[in-house]
Each structure stands twice: as C-alpha cells, then as structure tokens.
Amino acid sequence: MNPSTPSYPTASLYVGDLHPDVTEAMLYEKFSPAGPILSIRICRDLITSGSSNYAYVNFQHTKDAEHALDTMNFDVIKGKPVRIMWSQRDPSLRKSGVGNIFVKNLDKSINNKALYDTVSAFGNILSCNVVCDENGSKGYGFVHFETHEAAERAIKKMNGMLLNGRKVFVGQFKSRKEREAELGARAKEFPNVYIKNFGEDMDDERLKDLFGKFGPALSVKVMTDESGKSKGFGFVSFERHEDAQKAVDEMNGKELNGKQIYVGRAQKKVERQTELKRTFEQMKQDRITRYQVVNLYVKNLDDGIDDERLRKAFSPFGTITSAKVMMEGGRSKGFGFVCFSSPEEATKAVTEMNGRIVATKPLYVALAQRKEERQAYLTNEYMQRMASVRAVPNQRAPPSGYFMTAVPQTQNHAAYYPPSQIARLRPSPRWTAQGARPHPFQNKPSAIRPGAPRVPFSTMRPASSQVPRVMSTQRVANTSTQTVGPRPAAAAAAAATPAVRTVPRYKYAAGVRNPQQHRNAQPQVTMQQLAVHVQGQETLTASRLASAPPQKQKQMLGERLFPLIQAMHPTLAGKITGMLLEIDNSELLYMLESPESLRSKVDEAVAVLQAHQAKEATQKAVNSATGVPTV
C-alpha cells in the first residue's frame, strides 16, 4: 500500500473473509496493538444469529486504522487470511465502478494476498478480492484502486502479462447490466453459426460444401469424439454477419438425411446457460401459476394410506390430475399432495376434508405452498414473535414444571392451591402409557405454549416454604380426601380463622390457576415446608432436596421411592423406580406424599413395561417363524 493517506476521514475498517467462529474478543485481541479501539461489531444473520463472516473495527484515530490496514491485511485468524479495507458507508461510491478493475484467467494458486502484492505497485488499493467457491479460486477477481488513474496504469501494464505461467486479462470493471447489454448488441451482429442434429456421417468438407453457398467461411468444424466419429453438431464462422444470418434463415428446420437440422447463432457457454436458466424459470413460474390454487397439501395421513386410497378419498370433490403420498424407505411420511383440475374443486375439497377422520386420523388439508413461500411465512412469523418478546423486557419463558398465574400476584405473597389443582397442572413424564414420548407442550396450560406472553418468575408457583406441611400420620388418615380439597392442616387453620374473613374464591380457566383476588381476603394460615417421611429413613424436605447436588437429588428420591414401589410390585420395583426418576423432582416429592398419585404413575409404568414385553414376545415369535435370528 502506498504511504499516501487515503481520502477517507473515517477510522473504521471493514474486515472480511472471517471464519464463522471468530468472535469480537478475538478481533479485539488482534487489532488492539495497533491503537485504541472504540468498538468492534461482527455482522450476523437476523434469523440464525450466525456470523456473516465480516466485521467492522472502529479505531479512535485514523492513523491507527491505517497502521492496522498496512500491517495486518491478510493475517490469518483461525486458519483463514482476513481481508481488510476502509469502510465505505456510501453505497453509491462502492458501486460506481470508478477505479475498479477486473482480472481473469488467474492461476488457481493466486489468492487475495498474491494478487494484492502484484497490483500494489500501481497505486493505493481500497479492496482486492479473488472470487472463490468451495473448490477454491474461480480464476478471476477484482481490484478497487483509490483513483481512476491508478486503475488505468494497472490495466495498461498488466493486461496480457504472464502471471504464474498464465496470460491474464485485465480490464475496466463492468456491471452485469452493462455486460448483458454488450452481449445483446454483439448477438445481433453474429458471424458464427451453430448446426446440430445432422447425424454421424457428416465431416468438415461436407459441412463446408453445404454452407459455402451463403458466403465465404473463415472456418468450419464438426465436433468429434475420441474415435473420430461425429457428435452430430458443428460450427461455421462466416466473414460477414449478413451471410451468417442468411444461412440461419434458409437452413434452420430443413431436413438432411431424414433428420431435421437446427441452425442458429452460436452462443458462448455463459449465454447459453443464462438463456436456458431464463427459459426454465419461465416454465417453472407458469407451472406454479397454473397449479397455485388447485394443488392441495394433506398431512396427518394414516400409515396405511397409499396413492390409490388418497385419490379415492378426494375423488368425490372433482377430477384429480394427480395424488401422491410421500414415501421414505417404502414407508409413508404421513403427508402427500392432491391436485385437482379446477380451483373450485380444490376449494370444495379443503372445506369438506379438513379435519375429517380418514382411517384413524383427522386430516389437515390446505393449499400447497412452495418451499420459498413457506420459508418466508415462517421467517415472518418468527420475527413477529421475537418482536413481541422484545417488547416485554426482563421476562423469560418459564421452564417445564413452572405454572403461570392469570393475574400477577402481590409481591412476596403467594396463594395456596389445593393439591387437586397442583396434580392437574403438573408436567407429564417423558413416557406415556402407550410408550410414546409426548410433545414438549402436550397437556400444558395454554398460557405457557410457544408464542404466549411470558411472565416474570415472581408470578410463578409458590415457594416451597409456603407449601403446607402434612405429617405422615395425617396423610394416611386422610388419604381419601386429599385429592378433592384443601389439605387437613390448611383446612383446620382456615376453620380457626374469624368468621368475618371472606374465603377467597378461585376462577380456573383454560387449565391456568389464578391467584387469590384480594390480599386482605386471604386466610392467615402459617405455611410450613413440605416434608416426606419414609419408615426407617431421614425426613426429606424440599429445601433439603434443593441443597443437595443434582446427581444426589435423584438418588435421595430413588431411595425413598423404591421401598414404596417394592411393596406394590416386588419383581418390577427396580425398573419402575428408574422410569419414575425421569419425572421432575417436584412431581416426585408430591408423589411421595400422595399414595394415589404414586399408584397411578406406577400403574402407568407397569402398563408400559407389559406392552413392551408383549411387543418383544411377538417379535421373537415372528423371527422364529421366519428363521430370522433374534438379537
């Protein structure tokens, strides 16, 4: 880089080609020796929050930024050389093309630094970039000089020179629109003609005789394979465009040796690919437009439904052009597509079939969306959800096992809930009676589903110190009443309350339990800690459990669960205990206190084990009958 000071008064540097794992701390450690840094920002993707592989480093002084640009450009950070240039905030200057040159036919070994070192002698460089893909250099690059004069010097000296044994082309940078306009202008004055579909018996001489009548030809070539046999196409280069145009007009579509030949303007590979891409996109758009309102997406299909059954289910609503159940490994993926002949038929099918039970499952039927449309919709929905979350500061989503109140409670004052309400709101275990894992939000209150408003932790379930204590003697004596009303200790305390106090009423809606309506109306009940006592073992309280290390907590609960389960199912006690220990600790504490709740969960676990054993027995019987060895 020339010692001349750049014309940019800013002290901000653009740092590109970063490794995805590079952090602001790494960049600070790298650039701080150059001088005081005001800020560093790695630009990130809005959706994934992943690095966009470039950053801005803002120095306090311009001379420090220039020193970093001179000494640190192309230094390696996490195995990748970084590309540094002045930050240009004005997009019109970045895209003007002034001082920007294009270099092509570069050797694969030429990287950003090698190209930078080669062209730095011609002037002050703002940016130097060799275009690469996953396979390395694509053989061309761009160099942006500070001045137009420096770019002209580079073009004059470098165009046609040998670089690593290859002759490079260096020219003024042109935008895509300019290049396409030039190609279009040249296409109208074409001298070269492309001929195809003339068979294998054609050679250069015969092709020259065939097209020589239209005018003088500079060259004629029939393309051949390794054995010298014609590939069925070739080229003729005329001296004048008029002769080439005449050959195309007269020969295109004529029959030659029983075949209809094609004669047209010879195109470069890039032109042909662009034209084919444009044609394909047009066909794709036409197909999308045609099927946009007649193609239906059907999901939640029963495993036994195939293409024929899907067609039969939807055939009463109109003419079906196609019906397809998506498969993977010979098994249904649970969704498919049905295409009707008219929008009216498709609309009627959506109205009638959405929610209808076919086989054993209710169907979901809607108009099919393209992948891009669906991704755009989901992205928009995600951004709206994130915006609503950011609008409520200092709030987090409650973890599984915490319950949200419909009305915020008075600070430091928690309401008392009967055990029956707690039991209904407790999280389900990770296994069910059918042996399937439930959805993470299955059976949860609607208030804590994804997308619902979030609340501070201060409004969550009451602290353990406020849960009424029930001694083991009371628990045994009042087993039959514990799941239908307040616990005896709380009931006795409430009975001793003066009659002038109003007993609070609760309103339970949508599975969400509410706090008491008025603080003054709450009975003055002294809450004590929940205690669980098992014969021959030390009393286990919630605070004692919480103070133990996480790995010790399950052990403490397991030691108290095992003897209780062993009394019910001596042979399966070990397996059942292991299954129950997957449940949340607060649920396990409640189960230790409530024999009914424990027995219910034990019965579910036994049902799961029996179903699993029956399945294994059936599989063994099938394997024995078919001669397949059992593992």
Curated annotation (Swiss-Prot):
Source organism per UniProt: Homo sapiens
Residues with PTM Phosphoserine: S315
Modified residues annotated as Omega-N-methylarginine in this record: R426, R430, R449, R513
Modified residues (Phosphotyrosine): Y140, Y364
NCBIfam families linked to this entry: PABP-1234 (TIGR01628)
Keywords: Cytoplasm, Isopeptide bond, Methylation, Phosphoprotein, Repeat, RNA-binding, Ubl conjugation
Modified residues (Dimethylated arginine): R501
Residues carrying N6,N6-dimethyllysine: K361
SUPFAM superfamilies with a match to the protein in the record: PABC (PABP) domain (SSF63570), RNA-binding domain, RBD (SSF54928)
The protein's name: Polyadenylate-binding protein 3
Keyword tRNA processing: no
Cellular component annotations (GO), alphabetically ordered: cytoplasm; cytoplasmic stress granule; cytosol; extracellular exosome; nucleus; ribonucleoprotein complex
Task performed by this protein: Binds the poly(A) tail of mRNA. May be involved in cytoplasmic regulatory processes of mRNA metabolism. Binds poly(A) with a slightly lower affinity as compared to PABPC1.
Residue ranges of domain RRM in the record: 11-89, 99-175, 191-268, 294-370
